[in-house]
């Protein structure tokens, strides 16, 4: 009777700025490391943005005093890394030269804890799912000492948890800097809150689904990020995570997320967006085999 | 400061000038005015001396006092909706006259809108106030058929809300947290059930509601926007009454009656929701079978010790519970308790001492038996408030007193259980003391001119604990912490003093017209931290500290009041301008939930609000009601927000607040067809609220992120809001017939009668669903209506 209702509209928007966007979340991993430099698009444009070509992009390890020139590819500037270039504790600079101006950003690669394990739990039917089901968690301990920031990425059966509401971050063992939990197992919302999809990927199915069934796998990566990147992603979370429905009451005002990409000319009026960060990565995964499932059930009934 | 001093001196001069003339034989006639049917005190009833232009009104406890020269007088007691009463007095000594007025039989001719004298709006010094008695509130068609105090005041000029489901209300461009909501003088920190759909006040226990939008007397303070003063019934001191109702959302029951006839009485009123009806609001977020309910219990008792002493004890307990299972859920609620002691030191000096406790808390829990994450927040206050009314003479009524409030804030409790092991990581509690002393005089200077002038000295002390010191940064970024240290427990970390002058005048141009004006300065020492589209139950209260200055507001208002056809019609026009300082705003991505460094993410700015309120009311006849139109602006200027291209300094430009609603039209009409059937209707038209539309989208970190060219805030408006509600009441359906005692009625209401999908917000998001990495992503704009259909409701109410 009181259901809220929503419908899509096509309002006319102000003129877009179409500014340069630098998407540079690099890691210490081997293989291809990519920096995407594109232009922002009019808000309702849904095509993939094209790479801005003809730029000079350089990654500098300020601590080791080494620099790497990135190669222009079809949709990114990249490095094919065969020997490690990212080291915990090192400071890095990304330099982007356009014909008119030079932009740079600084990031520090911070430590990352290992993942002890990925585990599954057996649950009887509850208010979320009306049948017995398995849920997953990962176990990892934040090292002692405050100020560690992490971005936790995960994949179920190889599909990335990339929905806005699945952006999972930790500050020390908890969620944000103002919540002082340090040097212990990540809090439950971080361990389990974002990797148990109860909604089906099929839009036709509205009932809650068991997050994991026998045969599914989960792979988790913890990326260390620096404080500036943490603040950036935290603000980004509020901008992209629009629950809709009654949840809109809890949404915060729309505003621009920060950037650490700066012109080398302090008087520059050019706006750029995007972020540069260097992450150390730890990873672990496990498949919910029938053996794992039986063990979880046994543990539950103990 | 110069202005303050000037006003203080002026006040003193006026007082001295008007010293009572002791030379003559002066005697006082005083007493209480009550309802003869149930003993309830009559607030704001008039007492006039026949043949002379002398009179007074009863205070909130029904007390009056007039001092006159020796002689014979006829006193005329009046209260709208009651038979007038006259009493001859031969005044040769101080005389106590407690009077009981009889409710009028002629219901159809009665003014339904408010009590008071028929020309109260002309003669009273007060302006920028709005009063509703519970009888008129009960007549309005209500959302889901539930009579609601807060929803009713939203029909008054200058009062708005950002939409259905939003908690609280906005007054003259102020935010929700700038309203002080008092229930029998105890502040209620969160006035809503079920987010903002219903208010926490049980109409069966409410007697009188008064809203001060401006011209606030000196005895009130602590918030910069408004004071909503709700008074509870005392309980029938003559006979037992049981009243209640069965509605679509609540079922209600109230019992009142004498403990000892005319000496002591009580009222207990309770409500509880039928959860499943409303749970459907949450269809998107929650599954079926969600346990969800809310309830409140209101109780009051009073004891008439003797002629000079009366005590009252009242309490409120309410809670909203939304539980998924024993380890997951959300709940919140208020608790208040007030003790009051009315004492007459003499016929001329009335005093009231109030002591109260008020608490608000909420909590979330998430997890299972081994892994649980619980967070919450709480604010508690203990308050003592002595107040004196000194009825000096017929021309002066002095009010003075003080207030001391002790605050305890629990900004964030956090209990974390991981693999069976529990750690408590709650943030440190914070303590503060607020105090005030004030004096105010109502002075009748001439037949035409009356003044109310007062001064309030307020004080706030933020007490010991951990002190955080932050450095400067570009506005809009998190401020860096530069020092963190312990301060002794009861030591003063930061304190503030402020003088708050209050001044009102009423120039009576004729018996049917007056010109009124006021200046009000208010300070606010505690802040409601809310960075969401609408105020919600998880907003936390935060004291002023070494990092947050108290808010301040100066308001001037000027009004013209005119009555026509023997007070059948009341018209008024008021213009106001409000300057606000040290308004709280937030950096982008501020974490206002549980955050010990919250202050590093707060911004401070100034605000301004101005507008014009036009109001017309028809008081008598079968058709009564009012129309109002408010033209208003409300804007903020905060560095770090809406700063355009100024990347370096980020000096903010003025931007409209979320509750800036240019045009606001309200209509309330009541029609009494006959003794049995009456109709009512409300209509609201409100300009769309401002919101921010993006211009661009960025691809970064694997997400599509909105971007706003030129860093604008609130650059667009959502479509206008308008809604019609209709109501019908059929009296005495079962009771009152065939010799059955008591009365009852069936109230039928239709909310949103023409089923408009009023927009609550327009939001921008990427398409829903899982998009494979690297695929193009669509972005959409969605218009949301919280209530998108006609909502009919039926309720049965009874009293016997």
Stretches with model-predicted labels:
Chain B
Residues 32-38, 45-50, 76-82, 92-146, ...:
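Short, acidic, small-residue-rich periplasmic hinge/interaction motif at the N-terminus
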Residues 99, 155-156, 200-241, 252-254, ...:
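A beta-strand signature from Gram-negative outer-membrane beta-barrel systems
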Residues 112-117, 121-179, 183-216, 233-234:
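Periplasmic N-terminal accessory/gating domains of Gram-negative outer-membrane beta-barrel systems
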Residues 361, 408-419, 461-482, 511-555, ...:
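Surface-exposed extracellular loop regions of Gram-negative outer-membrane beta-barrel proteins
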Residues 381-385, 426, 434-436, 543-549, ...:
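Outer membrane beta-barrel strand-and-loop segments of large Gram-negative receptors
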Residues 404-514, 641-643:
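Signature of Gram-negative outer-membrane beta-barrel scaffolds
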Residues 576-579, 598-695:
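Gram-negative outer-membrane beta-barrel transporters
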Residues 676, 684-704, 721-725, 729-800:
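C-terminal beta-signal and adjacent terminal beta-strands/loops
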């Amino acid at each position: 009777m009181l259901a809220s209702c929503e419908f899509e509209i096509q309002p006319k928007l102000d003129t877009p700025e179409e500014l340069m966007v630098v998407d540079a979340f690099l890691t210490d991993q081997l293989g291809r490391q990519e920096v995407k430099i594109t232009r922002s698009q009019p808000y309702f444009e849904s095509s993939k943005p094209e790479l801005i070509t003809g730029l000079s992009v350089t990654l500098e390890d300020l601590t080791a005093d080494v620099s790497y020139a990135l190669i222009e590819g079809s949709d990114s500037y990249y490095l094919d890394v065969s020997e490690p270039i990212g080291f915990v504790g090192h400071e890095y600079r990304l330099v982007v030269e356009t014909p008119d101006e030079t932009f740079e950003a600084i990031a520090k690669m911070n430590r990352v804890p290992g993942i002890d394990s990925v585990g599954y739990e057996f649950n009887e039917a509850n208010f979320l799912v009306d049948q017995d089901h398995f849920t997953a968690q990962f176990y990892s301990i934040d090292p002692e000492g405050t100020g560690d920031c992490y971005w936790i990425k995960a994949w179920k059966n190889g599909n990335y948890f990339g929905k806005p509401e699945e952006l999972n971050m930790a500050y020390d063992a908890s969620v944000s800097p103002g919540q002082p939990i340090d040097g212990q197992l990540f809090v439950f919302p971080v361990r389990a809150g974002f990797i148990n999809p109860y909604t089906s990927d099929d839009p036709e199915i509205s009932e809650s689904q068991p997050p994991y069934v026998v045969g599914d796998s989960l792979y988790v990566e913890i990326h260390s990020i620096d404080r500036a990147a943490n603040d950036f992603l935290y603000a980004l979370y509020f901008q992209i995570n629009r629950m809709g429905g009654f949840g809109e009451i809890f949404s915060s005002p729309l505003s621009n997320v920060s950037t650490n990409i700066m012109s080398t000319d302090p008087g520059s009026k050019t706006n750029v967006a995007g972020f540069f960060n260097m992450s150390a990565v730890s990873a672990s995964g496990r498949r919910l085999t029938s053996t794992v499932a039986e063990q979880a059930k046994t543990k539950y009934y103990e | 400061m110069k202005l303050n001093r000037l006003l203080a001196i002026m006040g003193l001069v006026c007082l001295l000038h008007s010293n009572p003339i002791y030379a003559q034989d002066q005697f006082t006639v005083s007493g209480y005015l009550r309802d003869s049917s149930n003993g309830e005190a009559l607030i704001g009833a008039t007492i006039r001396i026949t043949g002379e232009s002398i009179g007074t009104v009863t205070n909130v406890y029904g007390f009056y006092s007039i001092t006159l020269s020796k002689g014979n007088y006829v006193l005329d007691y009046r209260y709208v909706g009651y038979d007038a009463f006259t009493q001859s007095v031969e005044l040769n000594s101080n005389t106590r006259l407690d009077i009981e007025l009889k409710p009028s039989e002629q219901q159809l001719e009665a003014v339904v809108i408010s009590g008071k004298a028929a020309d109260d709006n002309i003669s009273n010094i007060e302006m920028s106030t709005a009063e509703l008695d519970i009888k008129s509130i009960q007549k309005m068609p209500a959302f889901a058929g539930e009579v609601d105090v807060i929803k009713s005041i939203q029909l008054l000029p200058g009062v708005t809300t950002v939409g259905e489901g939003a908690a609280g209300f906005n007054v003259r461009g102020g935010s929700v947290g700038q309203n002080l909501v008092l229930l029998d003088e105890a502040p209620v920190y969160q006035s809503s059930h079920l987010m903002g759909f219903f208010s926490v006040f049980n109409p069966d226990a409410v007697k009188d509601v008064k809203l001060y939008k401006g011209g606030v007397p000196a005895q009130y303070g602590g918030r910069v926007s408004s004071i909503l003063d709700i008074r509870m019934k005392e309980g029938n001191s003559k006979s037992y009454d049981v009243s209640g109702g069965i509605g679509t959302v609540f079922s209600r029951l109230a019992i009142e009656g004498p403990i000892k006839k005319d000496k002591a009485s009580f009222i207990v009123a309770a409500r509880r929701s039928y959860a499943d009806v409303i749970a459907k609001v949450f269809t998107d977020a929650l599954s079926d079978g969600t346990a969800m309910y809310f309830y409140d219990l209101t109780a009051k008792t009073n004891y008439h010790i003797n002629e000079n002493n009366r005590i009252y004890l009242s309490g409120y307990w309410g809670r909203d519970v939304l539980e998924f299972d024993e380890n997951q859920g959300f709940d919140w609620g208020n608790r208040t308790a007030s003790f009051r002691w009315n004492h007459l030191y003499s016929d001329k000096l009335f005093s009231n001492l109030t002591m109260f406790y008020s608490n608000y808390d909420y909590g979330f829990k998430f997890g299972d038996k081994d892994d649980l994450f619980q967070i919450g927040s709480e604010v508690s206050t203990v308050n003592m408030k002595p107040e004196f009314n000194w009825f000096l003479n017929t021309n002066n009524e002095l009010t003075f007193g003080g207030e001391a409030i002790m605050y305890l804030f629990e900004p964030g409790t956090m209990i974390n259980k991981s693999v069976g092991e529990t750690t408590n990581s709650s943030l440190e509690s914070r303590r503060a003391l607020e105090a005030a002393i004030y004096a105010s005089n109502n002075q009748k200077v001439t037949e035409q001119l009356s003044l109310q002038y007062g001064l309030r000295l307020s004080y706030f002390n933020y007490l010991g604990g951990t002190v955080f010191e932050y450095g400067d940064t570009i506005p809009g970024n998190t401020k860096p912490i530069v020092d963190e240290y312990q301060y002794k427990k009861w030591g003063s970390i930061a304190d503030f003093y402020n003088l708050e002058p209050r001044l009102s005048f009423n120039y009576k141009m004729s018996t049917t017209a007056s010109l009124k004006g006021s200046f009000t300065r208010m300070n606010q020492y505690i802040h409601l931290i809310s960075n969401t589209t609408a105020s919600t139950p998880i907003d936390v209260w935060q004291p002023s500290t070494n990092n947050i200055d108290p808010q301040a507001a100066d308001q001037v208002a000027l009004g013209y009041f005119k009555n026509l056809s023997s007070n059948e019609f009341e018209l008024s026009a008021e213009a106001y301008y409000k300057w606000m300082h040290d308004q709280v705003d937030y950096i982008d991505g501020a974490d206002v939930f549980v955050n010990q460094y919250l202050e590093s993410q707060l911004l401070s700015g100034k605000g301004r609000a101005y507008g014009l309120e036009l109001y017309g009311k028809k008081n008598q006849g079968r058709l009564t009601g009012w129309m109002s139109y408010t033209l208003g602006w409300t804007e903020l200027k905060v560095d770090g927000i809406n700063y355009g291209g100024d990347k370096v300094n980020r000096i903010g430009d003025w931007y409209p607040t979320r509750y800036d609603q240019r045009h606001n039209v309200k209509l309330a009409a009541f029609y009494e067809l006959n003794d049995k059937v009456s109709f009512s209707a409300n209509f609201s038209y409100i300009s769309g609220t401002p919101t921010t539309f993006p211009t661009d989208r960025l691809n970064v970190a694997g997400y599509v992120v909105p971007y706003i060219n030129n860093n604008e805030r609130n650059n667009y408006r959502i479509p206008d809001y308008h809604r019609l509600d209709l109501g019908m009441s059929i009296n005495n359906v079962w009771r009152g017939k065939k010799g059955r005692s008591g009365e009852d009625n069936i109230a039928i209401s239709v909310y949103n009668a023409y089923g408009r999908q009023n927009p609550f917000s327009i939001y921008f998001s990427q398409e829903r669903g899982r998009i494979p990495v690297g695929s193009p992503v669509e972005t959409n704009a969605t218009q949301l209506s919280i209530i998108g259909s006609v909502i009919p409701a039926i309720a049965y109410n009874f009293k016997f």
